[in-house]
Amino acid sequence: MSKKIAVIGECMIELSEKGADVKRGFGGDTLNTSVYIARQVDPAALTVHYVTALGTDSFSQQMLDAWHGENVDTSLTQRMENRLPGLYYIETDSTGERTFYYWRNEAAAKFWLESEQSAAICEELANFDYLYLSGISLAILSPTSREKLLSLLRECRANGGKVIFDNNYRPRLWASKEETQQVYQQMLECTDIAFLTLDDEDALWGQQPVEDVIARTHNAGVKEVVVKRGADSCLVSIAGEGLVDVPAVKLPKEKVIDTTAAGDSFSAGYLAVRLTGGSAEDAAKRGHLTASTVIQYRGAIIPREAMPA
């Protein structure tokens, strides 16, 4: 029987500059991960569900249609009257450096745990095999909704499910660093697999040797710690099994076009192998291969035919 993973988060409308024109698309860290998992697994082994809230507008419908086309199940995505998806604009300067502007205060995704349907959705999610979320999934919620989400994660684990967390830290989405540290600590205490980006760890906790970062994460109760280091090797530490160092795929500089979804796609490649019975080392190799392919194309979601075999 197929196992089920629910990816929880927010997808936004993306506006980006293309010469003198503005191009419209959509994006979000967890959505990127869900699409790249779905592209790399047999649905008979693992089905991918995306959990968020959207409006009843045409932009929201276009998002849903696109996700269906990627074999991402949206049966647990809510549609909310009088709400819209969030929006962000990417401005690119003459050197290629990007600046992001966000409009998300009233985005539907912030309120997915406050609706009448949320209790029934949580009841269903508590029986999934895997729940995946990121720091952004937590950041956009009210403190009350965050507590509901943490309760759901604990219930899922009590039912035999596993929780997967990516530490994606965006300071502007949080009231303070202290608040984030407190929430992340609670999150790690109910996490089975943690994906850590060192830049985010350093920004939140202060710069520490990677060994200390891994030890702190294990001490919080996380069994499997995956440290993503961009173009450098990835480190995987499984409690009681030691450290695995897996080299990245090296690309010539001119091949690197856009690193927007590098981390999201690495996590997807890793999970596509790991959650279907593969070893941590093979999972990390697939993560590197996926990320190294994605960064050779512009935009977060690359053409399906460009995916590695």
From Swiss-Prot:
One of its GO terms (cellular component) is cytosol. Optimum pH is around 6. InterPro entries: Carboh/pur_kinase_PfkB_CS, PfkB_Carbo_kinase, PfkB_dom, Ribokinase-like. CDD domains: KdgK. SUPFAM superfamilies: Ribokinase-like. Its EC number is 2.7.1.45. GO terms for molecular function: 2-dehydro-3-deoxygluconokinase activity; ATP binding. It holds the Pfam family PfkB. GO terms for biological process: D-galacturonate catabolic process; D-glucuronate catabolic process; DNA damage response. It comes from the Bacteria. It catalyses: 2-dehydro-3-deoxy-D-gluconate + ATP = 2-dehydro-3-deoxy-6-phospho-D-gluconate + ADP + H(+). PANTHER family: 2-DEHYDRO-3-DEOXYGLUCONOKINASE, HEXOKINASE FAMILY MEMBER. Catalyzes the phosphorylation of 2-keto-3-deoxygluconate (KDG) to produce 2-keto-3-deoxy-6-phosphogluconate (KDPG). Belongs to the carbohydrate kinase PfkB family. This is 2-dehydro-3-deoxygluconokinase. It comes from Escherichia coli (strain K12). The gene is kdgK.
